[in-house]
Structure formats: structure tokens, C-alpha cells
Amino acid sequence: MTEFQTIRIDVDDDRIASLTLARPDQHNAFNRQMIDELTAAAAELAGDDTLRAVVLAAEGKSFCAGGDLRWMQAQATADRHGKMAEARALAHMLLALNDLPMPLIARVQGNAFGGGIGLMAVSDIVIADAAARFALTETRLGLIPATIGPFVMRRLGQAGTRQTFITGSVMSAERARQLGLVAMVAAPGQLDDALSVELKAVRAAAPGAMRIAKSYALSQLGQPDADTIETAIHILADSWEGDEASAGIAAFFDRTSPPWAS
């Protein structure tokens, strides 16, 4: 496997791969390098017919805080072409993980905001620590969760989507489980034990049958197509170019409240 700088891949003797986000000092927030490395890693993993499953994990206190601050600043000042290029890279990364032929199991601790929820939405099974917290906070910045939207909406359904997309409020692991974002909530200190239980089930299933079952499920449940993703990219670019985004992002970096907050 290729050695990366922002992520790490390990494979155990049972051919279970671990894909680990490795920017703990930045709460594993996305920048363009991490997005590109995750896309490349997904291609490598997809091409290995010996793998039985992939565990998506993260170093440090947080699973993924969403967009990296410097990356977000660059988006705010980029032209429309640049904004769309970055959004398209993020969408293609999520699609590559979503389409992995083997099961993708997310091990989630700490916070998962914005794009971190996108990673959860493209996973087949999500196991979260009871203390984990989740939010789509984009509207607080004057933005919308457009690029991750096609994947998250399919996971949450209409009611969950409307609530989480509009308000940006923080939800507990139990609430995320009720909405279908999380499959299992592990008791404090028991996250790895819960993951082990799930991996035991993976080891008991026929590898080829699991791949066929996943492919069949994806084909029947309806996945984002190219037009849907392209629409999301344009909507995000529109959002980035709006006055609210300019004010919200400026307030965020100035550590002040945006003009609409009360």
C-alpha cells in the first residue's frame, strides 16, 4: 500500500484494512491533500480482491471536524472555477468510498461535523462512542451542506434531512442512531469492543457474498448519479459566493458572531 501523509492504511492477518485519518492536531479536518489521498486510498483498496472489509477510523479526540480552516479560507477567496474544482474533488472522494466493493465500517469518536458526517454517510455500518457529537453546521456559516448532501440525505431520509440541514444543531450519538446515521452506539470506553463484535460478524460471512450483497443493495437503494453530484457542486459554489457566506466565514475567523446570530 502507498504511504500517505494525512491518512494511514494498515491490513491485519485476516485481511481487514484500517483506513485512518491522521491529522489529529487539526481534528482530522479535510484539506485538499487529505481529500486527494483518501480518493487514492479508496482506489487502492477497491483493487485488492483479498480484503474482507475496511474500517474507517481516526486518530485523536475527533473523528473529523469537516473542512480545514485554511482550506475554507482559500475557498472563500477562490474564483468560481476554483470553488467548483474543490467541491468536485470532495464529491469524487465520497463517491469513491461509497462505491468500495467491500464493507466499510466507520469507527467514530469525538466530534463529527460537516464533511465528517459525509464520511459516515458513505459507510455501510457506523459504530459511534456514546459521547460522540454530530452536526451539519454549515448554515451557521452562511453555507449549506451541498456536496455531502446527496449521500447524507439518502441516509437520513426526509425528516432527518430537514431538521439537520436547516438548523445545524448538535445531536447526540443516540439521536444520530434514531435518525439512521449511526448503527450502533457503544458505551463509554467500549468502542473497540463494539467494533470487534461487528468484525466478528464480517469474518463469519463469505467475502464474495458480502461484496455481491453490497453491490446489490447499492443498485436497488438508489445512489447519487453524476447529474445529482454536479447539481450539488453548483449549489455549493452559489452558496460560497453569497453575502451570508462572506459574513459568516469572516465572523468565524474573527471569532465574532455573524450578523444574523442572536
Regions found by a protein language model. Give the residues of each.
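Conserved CoA-thioester-binding segment of acyl-CoA-metabolizing enzymes
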Residues: M1-E59, L95, D192
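Terminal low-complexity tails and localization/encapsulation signals of metabolic enzymes
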Residues: M1-I7, A250-S262
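Hydrophobic/aromatic residues within transmembrane alpha-helices
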Residues: L19, L56, D68, L119-A121, ...
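C-terminal long alpha-helix characteristic of the crotonase
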Residues: P24, I127-A132, V182-E230, D238, ...
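A general structural signal for well-ordered alpha-helical segments in protein cores
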Residues: I35, G66-L69, A87-L90, G149, ...
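Glycine- (often His-adjacent) and acidic-residue-rich active-site loop
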Residues: A58-L95, A112, P224
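Crotonase-fold acyl-CoA enzyme core
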Residues: L95-G208, A247
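Short alpha-helical scaffolding segments that buttress acidic/His motifs in well-ordered protein cores
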Residues: T164-F165, A213-Y216, L236, F252
